[in-house]
Amino acid sequence: MVADSDGFRQLGADRLVSYAARRMTVLPIEFLRDSFPKLFARGMEVLENRAAAGDARAQRILDDVKGVTGAASLQIDDEPPVILSAQQGSLSAGDAPADQVPIRIMAALPGDALQLLLGEVAKAGALEDEEVAVGAAQTASKRFEDALAGRPMTCHITIADVPSLGNIDVRVGFNVSTLPAEPGFTTELRFPDLESVQRGELTVQDLFLGGKLKMEGDYSLALQIAMQLLTNPL
């Protein structure tokens, strides 16, 4: 499971919200365990309704999401990881992956920064935005899984110049059993540029081709996959 380019745009720092009876928690672990699966389910509901009304792109997204059988292990600071398991278009959370669902993604995230961001999101009141829910559903992508083809890929991501937070560092690994101390590559993106993507002033292609992403190390596989998905959108 992973966000495609639309999902990344829709799940930016000022849009990441939960759909839980019009309430959301700003506590990261509770958000992952309870709110995010509900947001995912809401996104699938929106897509199902659009597809039933004849929206061909919504149907393609549904097929892409439903094709995923995989889990993400998300660790907040030193807490035990929360495992999100996607299969047949549904998402569940637990201490272990669902039966016969392999872990395909591992990530380590800073709790304080995530809680502050979620708090800002709660104040924004974005619960009514269907596109946010659709973006949550798109974090599961069979197209991405197929493009990666089981190959390991690890990265340290820095979101720089975040207001009140400074830099936020996230460690991510695909098709690995543990997150290595030294990743295959590193990437840095300034928060103002991320906001420009959210506003539609920049595209993901602009980030890759316009020097907005500072990348070091062996990022050839990541670039190959990004170009493959971006040049063949759903």
Residue ranges and their predicted role:
Residues V2-L234:
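Feature captures hydrophobic
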